[in-house]
């Protein structure tokens, strides 16, 4: 795992610390109409339960702004105190001024320099939001997006570039514009009185190589806390892979303090998928541990039986279900490693390397399944109840190994 290239400022968002030596924070965003309090609260609760440590909500009109305090109140009634970030575009200055209770209830404001205001109004409207943030002691994310980049700034940089003897490519100018927009806005916010430890910045694009290039340069040019994410990752496998590759490379280099995976959900798919992907990225990089990991083989001609796949699914589902109570009872259980293997080739070796593992018989092998605990063979299972018996062994292992807090 890489070490931080630059020690960033630490920003407190509600009860969550972002930056410095703090763990990378998982974020998500709702897709409900914020004024629908019931649906919005339900989705925030689901995202938080899935592991989102900060949740962003759209605040795009007066009904949404008016609903924010009620949303926070309803969440508290469910004993949920996850920090909420208000996502503002175009009219944030108006909504925050007109609805001061909204400004107080939110834990952070997101401002887009590309649409906070246009022409002479840009600086004035940006300043209005910053002053409200200062008055309410709130942090701000200055979130630049290449789909809504400040066109006046881009035109200025293009003109300057055209006058150079060795001009940059259009792609390089786009990268420069993203970074310049973020850093000039952050500098202006500081000039207005917002402390550096109240500022998080992001420069989001939709292509993997562009994101990597922009953040590598950004990390060298500033010590603000950085929010990572592709702006539109896409749907399904494409979105997951693009996010894992881009965020994984940057995080491994020590760049990034908080992440969000902007997946397009499949029809009727749970919004929580983006949280699961964030957690898997961080856990597979060895940066954080959230739930016991299950190592399992993909199957081959030696494993003609589907039983090992079924057992793997049962074990993973059982661990995911139990973690809601285990994390309160058993300290360190989230780092447990379980192996479910399908034949003798790699089964015993992987099982020995896990905290607890089972090596199922492959085609033509003796119909027995040795169980290894802490590297040593501890049980031999056979018959029709291997799944139930192995899960019971896992349960007992957790109780004996991790004990109660």
From Swiss-Prot:
UniProt-annotated binding residues for [4Fe-4S] cluster: 297, 300, 343, 350
Catalytic activity: (2E)-4-hydroxy-3-methylbut-2-enyl diphosphate + oxidized [flavodoxin] + H2O + 2 H(+) = 2-C-methyl-D-erythritol 2,4-cyclic diphosphate + reduced [flavodoxin]
Required co-factors: [4Fe-4S] cluster
Xref: InterPro entries: Dihydropteroate_synth-like_sf (IPR011005), IspG_bac (IPR016425), IspG_bac-typ (IPR004588), NO2/SO3_Rdtase_4Fe4S_sf (IPR045854)
EC numbers: 1.17.7.3
Record's protein name: 4-hydroxy-3-methylbut-2-en-1-yl diphosphate synthase (flavodoxin)
Leading EC class: oxidoreductase
UniProt keyword annotations, A-Z: 4Fe-4S, Iron, Iron-sulfur, Isoprene biosynthesis, Metal-binding, Oxidoreductase
Top-rank lineage group of the source organism: Bacteria
General function of this protein: Converts 2C-methyl-D-erythritol 2,4-cyclodiphosphate (ME-2,4cPP) into 1-hydroxy-2-methyl-2-(E)-butenyl 4-diphosphate.
GO MF entries: 4 iron, 4 sulfur cluster binding; 4-hydroxy-3-methylbut-2-en-1-yl diphosphate synthase activity (ferredoxin); 4-hydroxy-3-methylbut-2-enyl-diphosphate synthase activity (flavodoxin); iron ion binding
GO BP terms: isopentenyl diphosphate biosynthetic process, methylerythritol 4-phosphate pathway; terpenoid biosynthetic process
One Pfam family linked to the record: GcpE
Cofactor annotation remark: Binds 1 [4Fe-4S] cluster.
Pathway: Isoprenoid biosynthesis; isopentenyl diphosphate biosynthesis via DXP pathway; isopentenyl diphosphate from 1-deoxy-D-xylulose 5-phosphate: step 5/6
Family: Belongs to the IspG family.
């Amino acid at each position: 795992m890489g070490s931080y290239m630059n020690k960033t400022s630490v920003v407190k968002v509600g009860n969550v610390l972002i930056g410095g030596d703090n763990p990378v924070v998982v974020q998500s965003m709702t897709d409900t109409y914020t004024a629908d309090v019931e649906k919005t609260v339900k989705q925030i609760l689901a995202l938080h339960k899935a592991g989102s440590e900060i949740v962003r909500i759209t605040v795009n009109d007066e009904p949404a702004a008016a609903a924010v305090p009620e949303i926070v109140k309803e969440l508290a009634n469910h004993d949920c105190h996850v920090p909420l970030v208000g996502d503002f575009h175009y009219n944030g200055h108006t909504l925050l001024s007109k609805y001061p209770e909204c400004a107080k209830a939110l834990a952070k404001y997101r401002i887009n320099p590309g649409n906070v205001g246009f022409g002479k109004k840009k600086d004035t409207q940006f300043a209005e939001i910053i002053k409200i943030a200062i008055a309410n002691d709130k942090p701000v994310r200055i979130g630049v997006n290449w789909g809504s980049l400040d066109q006046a700034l881009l035109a200025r940089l293009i003109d300057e570039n055209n006058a150079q003897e060795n001009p940059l490519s259009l792609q390089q100018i786009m990268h420069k514009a993203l970074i310049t927009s973020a850093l000039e806005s952050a500098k202006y916010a500081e000039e207005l009185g917002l402390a550096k430890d109240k500022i998080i910045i992001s420069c989001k694009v939709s292509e993997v190589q562009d994101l990597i290039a922009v953040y590598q340069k950004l990390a060298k040019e500033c010590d603000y806390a950085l929010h990572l994410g592709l702006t539109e990752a896409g749907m399904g496998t494409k979105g997951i892979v693009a996010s894992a590759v881009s965020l994984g490379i940057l995080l491994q280099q020590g760049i990034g303090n908080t992440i969000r995976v902007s997946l397009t959900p499949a029809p009727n798919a749970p919004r929580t998928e983006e949280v699961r992907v964030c957690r898997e990225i961080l856990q597979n990089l060895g940066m954080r541990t959230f739930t016991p990991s299950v190592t399992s083989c993909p199957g081959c001609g030696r494993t003609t039986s589907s039983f090992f796949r079924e057992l793997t699914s049962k074990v993973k589902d059982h661990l995911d279900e139990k973690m809601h109570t285990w994390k309160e009872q058993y300290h360190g259980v989230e780092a447990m490693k379980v192996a479910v293997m399908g034949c003798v080739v790699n089964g015993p070796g992987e099982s020995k390397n896990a905290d607890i593992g089972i090596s199922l018989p492959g085609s033509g092998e003796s119909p027995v399944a040795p169980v290894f605990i802490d590297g040593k063979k501890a049980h031999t299972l056979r018959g029709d109840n291997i799944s139930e018996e192995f899960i019971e062994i896992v349960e007992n292992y957790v109780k004996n190994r991790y004990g109660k807090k």
